[in-house]
Amino acid sequence: MDVVRELQNPDQGWMQRYEVVQELGDCFASVGEYENARRCYEKAAWLEPDEAGPYVGTGVIELQQGRVEDAEVAFRVALRLDAGSSRAHAGLAMIAQQTGRHREAFEAYLKSLELDSNNLTALLGLFQVSCQMGTFSQVIHYLKVYLQMHPGDCSVMFCLAALCARDGQDRQAVELLRDILSLEPEHTDARNLLEEMEHKAAHVNQE
């Protein structure tokens, strides 16, 4: 598909709709066709200058290609257009995390999740930063909120179990690990952590 020709062709009415062009850009970005994605986002921004979506998309592909400064500019433009963009806050959080500004990343991930508790990128980013900072209570809350909406997500369940274990909430961690193994009996990480916790509990009981 010649994206440039299609985008510039006035006879292609469907390519003159913001939603179509924006979604096409997201599709290209998801498969790593960044130049085609960029052209779509530029067209989408021209069609709807006040929409944040094209700038969020541009920020994502700039970040994927290692152009951190350009990504940050794009995410900040998105936030000027829409201060409630969860994805833009998550994008700035990822940049802060990559550049070692953990406190700033933590706050930006929290803001992203306040706006959309279903944002898995922000949730896992907050998990990583929380582990680096040793701050667990807020990410535990958002992991629980996410699991209320996605109760069978074993990857998030394991993140929550690991944090509970580190935070001294051993009973809840064990319950989560057993739930994971009932859903995925071959989940090696969950099995190993459960064995470690059961061994720890047995040692404590012996004392």
Where are these regions (language model features)?
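Helix-start (N-cap) detector for alpha-helical repeat units in TPR-like alpha-solenoids
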Residues: Y18-E19, A52-G53, S86-R87, L120-T121, ...
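Structural signature of tandem alpha-helical TPR/SEL1-like repeats
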Residues: D2-R5, V31-K43, Q65-V77, Q98-K111, ...
